Every structure is written in C-alpha cells, then in structure tokens.
C-alpha cells in the first residue's frame, strides 16, 4: 500500500486524536454501566501546511487525486511526535493482528522500532525475531518461532514511529493561493480500522 508523502512537512502544532467507543447506560438511581465497544482507539490526524511552494502543493494534490479522495487507504507514519530530546516516543498496546495457526510473520504498526515486547492475548511472548523496514510501506516486522494459534490477539509495545492505515476524511481538498506561487492547505485523515 502507498505511503503518505513525507515531504512537505506539516506545520506545528498538528493534531492526533484517539477515540474509543463506549456504550454507557445510566440507570434511574444514577448508577452507570459502561461497555467498551472498541478494544483499540480509532485515530484521526489534522495536518496544516501554511507555506507551500507550487511543487509542494502539487505533491499533496497528486497524492489526494491518486487516492480518489476518501476512497483508497494509505499508510501514515507519525514521524513528528517526539519526546523532549527529539527521539521517537513509546507506544503501548498497539494492535498487530490475530493468529491463524499458520502465519508466523506480521507487520508491526511502526517503523524504526526498538524496546519491543510482543503479546499473545496479553501474555508476553519471547520466541520472536524482528526485521527492520521489511514490511508493507517500510514497516518493521516480527517473526514468531511458532505461529500464534487461531484467534490469538497479537499486540505490541514499542518505541518508534507509529504506522496508521488512514484515508482522507473528506472527498474534497482545498488549496489557497495566498501569494505568487505560495499556497496553504489543511488535510484531515481518519484511521481505517480492519473489518
């Protein structure tokens, strides 16, 4: 799958929103009962580009057209969220996939990953090896010594750049020409969760 353009860089601040879906029932007594409907968050990303050259806006425009607006998904790597020292941040309990009893190689939801811990149904798994940049879109991969059993939930903790399967939030994209050969635009992305 294609990867969102790494250049031009968006301006700061940019926004990443994590959303869960919780069903809350309130009783006559005021007591509440909550039920989690989404095990993992659905994320959205808002990017601003305040000063773009004609070639930079064309890069974004061409990518948007190739994705047919909101129709086709793509990979987005969050290479912009860093710690105070400028290093990639830690991510906890990120979805990798589900075992099928035969697959041993899975893409990690990140690249340039380190400090990785794999989990099968919440229990850490030591029998794994990692490969850097060999997955779809340049993601890192994990190989299990033996295939996770059918239905096993595979998650990971890691430090690195988070990879998200996204789509454009809207079927329209505007570009504002605010000076000779200078443009600005904003882009909103929504995570496309697996079925």
Give the label of every model feature segment.
Residues 61-132, 148, 158-195:
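Extended beta-strand solenoid/passenger and fiber regions
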Residues 45, 116, 152:
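Residue-level detector of short, conserved catalytic/binding motifs and their immediate flanks
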Residues 6, 17, 21, 25, ...:
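Intrinsically disordered/low-complexity terminal segments and short unstructured peptides
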Residues 3-15, 119-156:
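Polar, enzyme-active/binding microenvironments
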